[in-house]
Amino acid sequence: MATWTKKDFDAAGVTEYPAGPALDQLRRNFGGSVVLALDVSGSMEGERIEKAVRGCRRFICEAVEANYSVGLILCDHGISGSVPVDYDPSAAYCLLAQAAIAGGTNIVPCLKLAHRMLLDARASDMVLAVFGDGDLGDPFEASRVAAKLTADGIRILTCGLGQSSAESLAIISTETSTTRVAETSTIADSIADMARGLRFLSR
């Protein structure tokens, strides 16, 4: 007599070729999503924005290679432009190519948009990475809104141009061991280096 019982096991189909609709679900379950926010306020003019765009492209490339879907926000005192989280970085690269400086500084609209974008992505690791050369705008409101992101399991990485900016942005960072500081000569490298904060990045 058989001593085993037949059971049904439901799981995402992983043997389809070409990949079927289960692929996106598997990526969400075992991968991550990151929104990269770039300050495009007026003080980012000249070589600052040029180097920042190069660094953002490198960050996005590393994130995609690590199985992260990527969204992008260009922010000043509001939202200059954005693309939703996706595993295809083409739209993010296209927006970066159009990045133009204007306006002042207020991180709050960026935080709110990134919050919605990341919750929609529903990944196992949700990250907001921010680069700027100024402050938060309204630090009290920024801290209040950032707390909502962290309550939903979203990690926040920040990098500022110069010590003053870095310390200001670090108020909303969930990293406790370091304050990421960029110099004008290292903007691209510093932005790209934030990818080290992605949990699933292989080094």
Could you tell me what each predicted segment is?
Residues 6-8, 99-104, 134-182, 192:
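VWA/integrin I-like adhesion module and closely mimicked acidic/polar interface patches used
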Residues 45, 78-84, 137-140, 166-169, ...:
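Switch/connector loops and helix/strand junctions flanking conserved nucleotide-binding motifs
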Residues 21, 55, 109-116, 141, ...:
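Well-ordered alpha-helical segments embedded in enzymatic catalytic cores
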Residues 1-35, 42-48, 203:
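Acidic, polar low-complexity linker/tail segments
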Residues 68-98, 113, 117-119, 167-175:
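Short beta-strand-loop
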Residues 180-203:
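C-terminal "exit" segments of structured domains
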